[in-house]
Structures are given as structure tokens and as C-alpha cells.
Amino acid sequence: MDRVSKGLIEYLLETINHPDLSGFELIEILDIRSQLAAREPVLSDNDKTELETIDHHLLELADLLVTRISEVADLAQMRKKAHVLPSHWWWYLDEITMRKKKAIG
């Protein structure tokens, strides 16, 4: 794996566990995750496992992330403006949390 990808993965592994991140910092995390998605073909199996760990944390923290991001931006508008692909599901955390809430209650 290249050093850039390794640095991005290490950054995400370190920052994803800090609940005091601002909405702007969380948007940066989503952007970095998209950068890594483009690099997935060149990632090692170990790197892909670490990326799965990051994805698991994103899903676990989805409610908090959506709340914090909504304080500074509208995810739906950001997706539309940036033409985000559905395969970059982390940009759809607002929809994921909404569907989860509907399913529960």
C-alpha cells in the first residue's frame, strides 16, 4: 500500500473515536473515507480490514455524526452538490439513521 493510503487510514482510526469532533471535522472524515474508496483496489487485505473497522465505527456512531454534521451542513445538499455515488454510503448516514428509526418505532 502507498504511504498516502496508510496515512489516511491511520488518521481515520485515530480520529473516529473522538466524540468531541466538530461537524466540520466529521465532514472531513467522510471526505477522507471517499478518498480511500477510490484507493481500495490497491489496498492490502490488512488495510481493507482496518477500513471495515472504520466503517463499523461510522455506523455505530451514525446518530451522533448526523447530529454534529447537521449543526454545520445539510448532508442531502452536500451529496447533491458533489454528485456523491450511493456506493459511498457514509455520505448517506442521515438516511440510514432515519430508516433505522422508522424500523424501530
Describe these PLM feature segments.
Residues 59-105:
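Amphipathic alpha-helical binding modules
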Residues 7, 11, 31, 35, ...:
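Charged, amphipathic alpha-helical oligomerization/scaffolding segments
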Residues 41-45, 60:
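Structural alpha-beta junctions
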Residues 26-30, 48-53:
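Short, charged, amphipathic alpha-helical segments
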Residues 1-30:
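Short terminal alpha-helical segments
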Residues 25-42:
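Amphipathic, non-membrane alpha-helical rod segments
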